[in-house]
Curated annotation (Swiss-Prot):
Applications reported: Fusaric acid is phytotoxic to plants such as cotton and banana. It has been shown to induce programmed cell death in plants. In addition to a mild toxicity to animals, fusaric acid exhibits acanthamoebicidal, antioomycete, and antimycobacterial activities.
Region (Adenylation (A) domain): 21-343
Disruption phenotype: Impairs the production of fusaric acid.
Pfam families in the cross-refs: AMP-binding (PF00501), AMP-binding_C_3 (PF23562), NAD_binding_4 (PF07993), PP-binding (PF00550)
PROSITE patterns per record: AMP_BINDING, CARRIER
Keyword Transferase in annotation: yes
GO molecular function, one term: phosphopantetheine binding
SUPFAM superfamilies per UniProt: Acetyl-CoA synthetase-like, ACP-like, NAD(P)-binding Rossmann-fold domains
Annotated Carrier domain residues: 544-621
GO biological process: biosynthetic process
Stated name of the protein: Non-canonical non-ribosomal peptide synthetase FUB8
Lineage, top ranks: Eukaryota, Fungi, Dikarya, Ascomycota, Pezizomycotina
Amino acid sequence: MGSISHLPVYGHRLLPVVIDEIARDEPDRVLFYTPRNGQPSQGYDKVTTKIFANSINRLCGWLDSQLGSPTVSKTIAYIGQNDLRYFIMMIASTKLGHRLLLSSPRNSVEGHVSLIKQSGCEFWIASSGLDHHGFLQDLQIPSVEAPELSQLLDPTPLKPYVYQKSWNEGKSDILALLHTSGSTGLPKLVPVYLETAATVDGFHLMELTNGKRPTGVEWTGTRQLCAMPLFHVAGICLGLYSAVFFNWTVVLPSVGPIMQHVIEDALDHITLDSAFISPSVLQDISKSPRVLEKLSKLKFITSAGGPIPQSVGDLIHPRVPIMQTMGMTEGQWLASVVTHPDEWAYYYFHPRTGVEMRPYSEDLSELVFVQNPKLTATQPVFKTFPELDIWETKDLYSRHPKHPSLWKYEMRRDDLVILSNGEKFNPLAAEGKLISHPWIAAAYLTGRGRFQTAALLYPDETNLDKSDDTIIDNVWPTFEEVNRSLPAFAQIHRDFVKIVRTPFPRTPKGTLARNETEKAFTADINAIYDRSTHGKPSVHINGTTEVVVRSGIREAIEAVSGLVDLKDDDNIFTRGFDSLHVIRLAGLLSSAFDQPIEVEVGTIYTNPTVSQLARSVWSHLEHGPQDKIHHSEATREMLAKYAQAFEPPREAKEHIVITGTTGEIGSYLLDVLCNNDKVAKIWCLNRSADAFQRQVDSAKSKGLSSTWQSKAKFVRYDVAADNLGLSQDDLQEIKNQATAIIHNAWEVNFNLPLSSFEPQFVGLQSLVDICREARHKLRFFFISSISAAMNWPSDLLGPVPEASIPRFDAPINGYGSSKLVAEHLLSKAARSGVLSLSVLRVGQVAGPVKTLGEGSIWTRRDWVPAIIDASVHLRALPLDLGTASILDWIPIDLLTEVIGQLVVPVNAVVGQENYYNLLNPRTPSWIDALPGLKAHLEVSFSDKFEIIPLHEWIGRLRGAEKTIVKEVSEGSSETARRAQSGLKLLAFFEMLASGEEGSRGLEWSKGNTLAQSSILACMEPVSSAWFGTWLTQWGY
């Protein structure tokens, strides 16, 4: 290899000159791999420095033939397939002295026209297969089809077009005319000069920081997939600059829109060190265990173009390190240094960038470029704007709580949503959480100039045909999580959620174009707020008597909130009434009477029952507004209300607190306990405001008893708030009356690390604090999981004990670790005398087996239904289930009866700590169930089903993926749609298959459990009859 010592100093090198120099001195160095015919499955072509330089010469000749005299500088435009022609076109046009406009294919016609007029474009070039746009004729601009990439990469040597300018002569030549995203209006031109590009080359000049160089230099010699638009600054920086300046080998993506399959195609067909992937594509990948598994083979991934949602990053970074980079059209690539993998969301900007973080609000700072004469070779933004000394990026960051040099990108200044009351909030984190839901492809939060936040949701393509209510019902638990992270004024109410079926406008880099979205969906947004104001029926109240007023007020409350079975003395706030309901009720009542009356929100807050509010309104109608309250009467009423609670209980009945009753286990457990005569009262603590209605609907659909309302009281709680966010009245009532707590609510996500469960421990502490101050010593039942001990070394220590697990390597994942930590914390509380503890480790929960309602079904989200659905599509059943071949499953309706026996035992259980391993004591194997399962399916489908080894079954399912996806997209096969759930769990099935052949899994001690529960002791094994019930539930 020849010497290149004669090249100019870093930061003062002209890109066309560097390309010709390295082609001469390092002709065989591979710059790019480009997929043959745009398809990775056909292999990749190497593009060496020599071939690249020759392709530029070939295009120079073609441009000369099209444009005429090379001495006349013109502005030309190129729009094409996402391939190497973008880079070739940039260098060729620069060599010839032309200015190249790169207009994004995503631009509207209006956007294209605006850029043409701004740039003075005279000639339009497009690759084959792209529309040349009819508007060009109106503008009288000639257009032509570009040469195919294969033609340009012909290695036959051509006459070189030499770029002969010196640094001072060429630094102001334009490499390309890029443009802003247009997220706040029409796109604006941003010129990229050769001097601008050279500032990226200036990364070489930056000194070590924390032992590391800027990322471009640090990653020298790596082979990276550049899965970004190559007309965009991100693709240019990490595609062209990185290959030429930093000696990366850049693998270019397949043609077409950059989506998840583009990444997977590359991972399948070429060896990579890393991949450069946009946050929007990472979002899709985070929902695919299959692609995540492939991604984990890389050394790291890089991303830019917008923030990675926390929920997405938390899923990816345990598998492969994430290294974010920051860039902008005006400032190219912002030099940063690699951070610790756990700090993947943060940037460490190199000091030689000359950026400052200037306070913008209490928690946010704006990134600002400040011109420094000593940093001229490393400050690209002042090449773009030479007249400026300071450039405000409008990008807002938050400082790391422990490391002051680390900064996390939060949003653009324009992203802030400002409500009509002046309150501001950041919608991006909430949107990121919403799109982590598998049914949601995009989310947009708005509320500009409004009194309330609203949400638009765009479902993913597999759920577009579902009804709005079905989608919102499924996503609502995620909304509840979002609301816990939002300030109270910004929280999203169900009435302010709308499903749309038109994709949101996007910027060229794939991020949401907020202004365009607001404009494009104005009608939908207005409909949300119109519905909230006018959508409920008006109420007319004849204010002739207090009885009539009371009836009318009840009707008004039901109209604005949907509350049912509201009694006159029910506190509406404990029934789920919130601040938005108050505002709407005040407005409705103020216009409900024939005579003028203004019902203020304060009146509703101080009169929270139908009776009290009716009395207040009636008094107003009769006598005008009265400010005085009869304190003595109110005091006597309050005393009478709670006096009995402070007297000794007349009979030993249970008063039980349950967290999380609206879920699967909670619904059945509430039914069991309410039908137990020894249970007098149950407090149902749930996070959602509409838990009562959800419980009613769930009970009806499952065929459960609907008579539990007399025992159950629904209370909204917040796991992370002080005292769980309970009112003083509810808190005191629980402390005075409760005899037991069943802690059932816990986030179920097997992909999250332990740290993500920290809010659960805050809630656990609050429950223990209630135990400390309770009148009775509370029995605390913690619903744990066998995942807390799935790595128990039974070959050394025997069966998993009915005792505290002393090994912290016993859990199999973050979820299991969180359960184990909770077990140990509660054990400490029990040993200090605060409570009496029972830990219930729940195993595989199967579907119900009793004859119940249509809603009683083994949820299809579980892995067993997924196996059946996939087997139906394949017409083949697996011979075994690997390490899960032993069927120690318990149907959910029987499981909750077992829990009921443990919570309300015939004979009191003695001891401060009790541990129960809840698994079926009778354990047939999967192969025992196969004959009956096979026979049932063959009758149902009048077709034969094979039985094949699990490894082969997994291979068939993987091989059928393209067919399944195709049939789903065409809507031609219900079995294909159902089989998708199996595709999503391929990695899990492979984990089952990876265990030792013939492994029967762990053994679990159950002696104490069976002694305390006769139902479990006498439980039947999983049988053909049970499978028949489950198959019927699934529609087979």
